[in-house]
Regions:
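Non-catalytic linker/capping segments at the edges of enzyme domains
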Residues: 1-89, 109, 114, 127-131, ...
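Compact, glycine-rich, soluble single-domain proteins
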Residues: 86-88, 96-104
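Conserved short alpha-helical segments that host acidic/polar catalytic motifs at enzyme active sites
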Residues: 102, 108-109, 114-125
């Protein structure tokens, strides 16, 4: 296999960039956006959004940061074939994972180094579902607090919408980045 050199991003000001395309997200899943050993998104099919439409520094419920992303629903998405047969619905844990993914992406965007991991969630409520009839899933994150030290942590609340209707709410998510010991 050929050696792939990752681009250097030390001088890139990600905080001036407010939107990210699907191509950007795929680059992030390969470790090409924020640099080697920094926050990565999972690759498709586990990448749970197509684009990030907004990252806003002053906004959201806590007047810190807010992040919005979207996923266009296609009837042939892989999970509809198996969850459940003759009763297709997107697994609720995938919506939660999307919110964790988005919070982890935010830490990379903020310049926090290290690999991202979900550390927990306080409360999850499911009030609806995502079926093949849904056209667009929207994700919204409100960042409550960020700690930037040897391990960086983001604390956030989130919400998932199916065609504009709230279907999941999440409180007290914790996502962090850490530099693995060698």
């Amino acid at each position: 296999m050929a050696d792939i050199s990752l681009p250097k991003h030390e001088n890139v000001d990600f905080q001036s960039k407010k939107t990210f395309s699907n191509k950007d997200l795929i680059e992030c899943s390969r470790g090409l956006l924020f640099g080697e050993n920094n926050a990565q998104l999972p690759a498709p099919p586990m990448l749970m959004f197509d684009s990030i439409s907004n990252i806003e520094k002053e906004g959201g419920s806590f007047n810190k940061w807010q992040i919005d992303a979207e996923l266009a629903i296609k009837k042939d998405l892989w999970f509809f074939d198996c969850h459940f047969i003759n009763d297709p619905v997107m697994p609720g844990c995938f919506g939660l994972d999307a919110l964790w993914q988005l919070t982890g992406f935010f830490l990379g965007w903020l310049g926090c180094s290290g690999r991202g991991r979900a550390f927990g969630v306080g409360e999850v409520k499911f009030t609806g579902q995502i079926t093949p009839e849904v056209k667009l899933v929207s994700y919204h994150i409100d960042i409550k607090r960020v700690i930037k030290r040897q391990v960086s942590l983001a604390f956030s609340d989130g919400e998932v919408f199916a065609d504009g209707e709230s279907v999941y709410t999440v409180k007290n998510m914790k996502v962090g980045t850490f530099v693995p010991e060698e």
